[in-house]
Amino acid sequence: MEERGSPDGDLARSLEQGPEGPETPIQVVLRVRPMSAAELRRGQQSVLHCSGTRTLQGGPEVAFRFGAVLDAARTQEDVFRACGVRRLGELALRGFSCTVFTFGQTGSGKTYTLTGPPPQGEGVPVPPSLAGIMQRTFAWLLDRVQHLGAPVTLRASYLEIYNEQVRDLLSLGSPRPLPVRWNKTRGFYVEQLRVVEFGSLEALMELLQTGLSRRRNSAHTLNQASSRSHALLTLYISRQTAQQMPSVDPGEPPVGGKLCFVDLAGSEKVAATGSRGELMLEANSINRSLLALGHCISLLLDPQRKQSHIPFRDSKLTKLLADSLGGRGVTLMVACVSPSAQCLPETLSTLRYASRAQRVTTRPQAPKSPVAKQPQRLETEMLQLQEENRRLQFQLDQMDCKASGLSGARVAWAQRNLYGMLQEFMLENERLRKEKSQLQNSRDLAQNEQRILAQQVHALERRLLSACYHHQQGPGLTPPCPCLMAPAPPCHALPPLYSCPCCHICPLCRVPLAHWACLPGEHHLPQVLDPEASGGRPPSARPPPWAPPCSPGSAKCPRERSHSDWTQTRVLAEMLTEEEVVPSAPPLPVRPPKTSPGLRGGAGVPNLAQRLEALRDQIGSSLRRGRSQPPCSEGARSPGQVLPPH
């Protein structure tokens, strides 16, 4: 006799021990429903025999072994106790993801096992003795939460997969298709699914009845209330403790466990159920999703192919059960079969299906909050830093061994190099000191020479003006004092070079002096140095340096002054600005446009030398012309009359 299934062991004991080790197999419980009244009327007999609490005889040569086998005489309370759902609830409170789903042929009692019989009428409650696994789990869970010290938040969602479309059974409006998404943190999830928070058993029962009333049901030959969709009711348990805090990221799911109840639609043969039209389309969709689920289970059984790609995306059902089948959850499968001989082929198919499923293993892991993850992260970082410290210490020891022979030479070389740099800096500092001293001496010499030349220029200018005065007066003539004469208009030509003992008069025109300098462009100094009065000027005839410039278009200024003239005039202007000229100096010249600024300090010494030489030549030529010309008569001019230009 061929025996298939799990090895010997007690299901309750294995569930009470919890998920030990890296992998935990899917727990499978088999329930055989009683013979229906229709089957008894047709005279059909039971072909299944339970030999013990874990073995089912499917024929003379076939036997299947599961975690628990429940015959037709077992009640709903016996099923709840044998399945170990309480242990799953405890794991969910500790943060694990737990799933309970039923599987079997249509009409085998899957919905009855989970939710009990359908209500006989509106407002008529189901008898407590007939309540299914879901109602009993809800009552136990809420009673358990009341005795916990820490606050617990309970929420619920309810959906169905009908013709490969996910519909929300708790939506406020009419159910509409919802998309199934995936991310790294949550895995597969339904977007925009309504999650309702509850705090009492009555509120949760109301949510369950609302979902059951919206679920698609139809009648066919084998079942008068056949479910035409897969239904998933999920309880989210968020328990806050001192070591576990709620998630602060709104994009992540709440930290805590969940308990999911999955009522799969039964597989069916269209020929046996007599489905036509829409019922046949629903049957095809149900069979296709169950086939995808069986294919994923077969691939998960192969150790080599389990590490490869598992096609969970082939169906919406396999997407939502991916975490329960091959992920981080704890899964319980309740296989329901019919004992009738008419359903024996489908019953054997269900038994083989459940036998393969209990060999699938998962890796249960409770999600950790950021606070709970911190010690593990710190420990990992500490190990990495210790490893890096050992590696760097080893490299440092190797470098010390290699550099031990070169340490003495490096120190000596560094000392010699430092001494040489200090010597170079000292020599450079001394050279800069000497250069600075030489530059200061050159500056002082240039300033002294400039001062001497300026004094010589001043003296020569005074001599020039004095010579011009004596030449105009003639020898032996003393002009009368203007104080005894009629008043004359004041002179604006020159500052007072010489003055009368009782008043200040101009030595050239013999009129009282009004101020020190003439206004530019108003009065012109008479020509006293040029004896020629002809129409054309000789090339050597130039106006005195202190004369103001005339307009370029006038007859008195036929040409512009040369650059050398303006250079000499600029030197006189700078001396007047620096207050190095005696009060008897000529008035300030007007600076011509577009003239480069003169050099100051030592740069102006050559110009002063040139001016000194020019003044000497001018004084000599003036004295020679004075000797060659006869003196002018006394009556030729009056004391207040200005000499005409020659």
UniProtKB/Swiss-Prot annotation:
Alphabetical UniProt keywords: ATP-binding, Coiled coil, Cytoplasm, Cytoskeleton, Disease variant, Intrahepatic cholestasis, Microtubule, Motor protein, Nucleotide-binding, Phosphoprotein
Coiled coil feature spans: 372-467
Consequence of changing residue 337 to M: In PFIC8; uncertain significance
Compartments in which it is found: Cytoplasm, Cytoskeleton
Entry keyword annotation includes Endoplasmic reticulum: no
Highest taxon in the source lineage: Eukaryota
Tissue expression summary: Expressed in fetal liver, adult brain and pancreatic islet as well as in kidney tumors, uterus cancer and pancreatic cancer.
PROSITE patterns, per the entry: KINESIN_MOTOR_1 (PS00411), KINESIN_MOTOR_2 (PS50067)
Comp. bias (Basic and acidic residues): 1-13
GO terms (BP aspect): microtubule-based movement
Start and end residues of each stretch annotated as Disordered: 1-25, 529-565, 579-646
UniProt xrefs under Pfam families: Kinesin
Domain Kinesin motor, chain residue ranges per copy: 25-360
Modified residues (Phosphoserine): 6, 14, 369, 638
GO cellular component annotations of the record: cytoplasm; extracellular exosome; kinesin complex; microtubule
Positions with biased composition (Pro residues): 540-551, 584-595
Effect of substituting residue 352 to Q: In PFIC8; uncertain significance
GO molecular function, one term: microtubule binding
Binding locations of ATP: 104-111
Similarity-based family: Belongs to the TRAFAC class myosin-kinesin ATPase superfamily. Kinesin family.
Annotated disorder: Cholestasis, progressive familial intrahepatic, 8: An autosomal recessive form of progressive cholestasis, a disorder characterized by early onset of cholestasis that progresses to hepatic fibrosis, cirrhosis, and end-stage liver disease. PFIC8 onset is in early infancy.
Protein name: Kinesin-like protein KIF12
Source species of the chain: Homo sapiens
Gene name of this polypeptide: KIF12
